A protein has these predicted regions:
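Short beta-strand-to-coil "C-cap" segments at the C-terminal boundary of structured domains/repeats
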Residues: 112, 131-138
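A short beta-strand element within beta-rich, extracytoplasmic domains
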Residues: 27-51
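Extracellular and analogous surface-interaction loops
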Residues: 19-32, 97-103
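Beta-strand elements of well-folded, non-transmembrane domains
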Residues: 21-27, 37-41, 114-116, 135
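Extended carbohydrate-recognition surfaces in non-catalytic/accessory domains of CAZymes
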Residues: 1-27
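Beta-strand-rich ligand-recognition modules
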Residues: 47, 52-129
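Activation corresponds to long, low-complexity, non-globular regions
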Residues: 140-154
Length: 154
């Protein structure tokens, strides 16, 4: 089939990508955050992340210089199997994390390192991320937020 191009034309091992944006909030508020750095499917016998880690690549996220730690993973198995149900590895399968947005601009920074594109823990090492601010119940996007890497309100 046809390959869909990624951001990097020739991605290299042992590199780190950074992604950032600013989010304008019209008011100080607590919102939900869905974040993930590896999307899991049970067609692969991938292992869930280790406790306290987002993934096996050491990805990290900060909002306004405060690191956002991952949730407690419900799947804790250490043996690869297609027969073990997914837990809350994928962001839409868990309640969003509660995070604080200040009134005005909020900096969101992601660190996305890749050592190797092969791993004993996951078959398809994905250089990807999802970062979405949602209502605390996870039902919809937060109204009134403006996303801009240049801090423009347009």
């Amino acid at each position: 089939g046809t390959l869909i191009p990624g951001f990097y034309k020739e991605p290299k091992e042992n590199h780190t990508a950074y992604a950032y944006t600013y989010v304008y909030s019209p008011k100080e508020q607590n919102v939900g955050l869905w974040a993930e750095f590896q999307n899991y499917g049970r067609s692969e016998a991938d292992l869930p992340p280790l406790p306290g880690k987002w993934d096996y690549k050491e990805s990290r996220i900060w909002i306004n210089e405060q690191e956002i730690l991952p949730p407690v993973w419900t799947a804790t198995h250490r043996t690869k199997s297609n027969e073990i149900a997914l837990g809350n590895e994928n962001c839409v399968a868990r309640p969003p994390l509660e995070v604080h947005l200040q009134k005005g601009w909020n900096k969101v920074l992601l660190k996305l390192p890749v050592g190797k594109f092969v791993s004993p823990e996951v078959r398809l090492v994905k250089w990807m991320f999802t970062t979405v601010f949602v209502t605390l119940d996870g039902q919809k996007a937060v109204e009134g937020l403006i996303y801009s890497p240049n801090k423009t309100l347009e």
